[in-house]
Amino acid sequence: MDMNTILLVYLGISFTHLSFRSEGYQFLGDLTKVLLMPTLMLFLMQQGNYPLLLAALLFATIADALLNKGHQGSHFFWGMASFAVCHIFYGIHVLSLGVDWILTAIAFAGLMIPYSLLYRLIGKQKGAAKYLAYAMLLFMLASLLTGLASLLCIMGIVLFIISDTMIGLDSLEIRHISNTSEMGSYILAQLLLVLGFTAL
């Protein structure tokens, strides 16, 4: 199976998943969700040697399976922990490529503005520390990707932040956002990140 075919399969699974979610077919939606990242892993293996990216997508798959259980409780905690490991592997891969540290520092300083707003919004809520720690990790990865100067990767991490913000708002019961919106952002985020990394 060539790489273009694999990408078409990914897009097909994505469309099918979003359709199942929008129609309320929970089991089929859960099933197609856990097929997404393994499909991108096949694409990566066709592209070359990317062990860190494969590890990242493996933990993303674990996170997807755990978050099928919802945005509360121990499954949610371990799901987000798995995503944190995913981001760490992404970050290590970025560092192995080399970044512009000036761009990285500028991006990090800029991202501290929304981070401070997040702290003011949820800082006093019970269990806020884990959300704030996760957000810091995500913003650090976003800063590194800015230093990498890959437009695809930057677009990908922005969509990842949007998706995770939706999940966080739902988990904290601040605002419920449709699962299709959250997953649509996430599906495109992971695709853009993988395409960005393999284009470097």
Predicted regions, residues:
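Polytopic alpha-helical membrane-helix bundles and their juxtamembrane interface segments
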Residues: 1-200
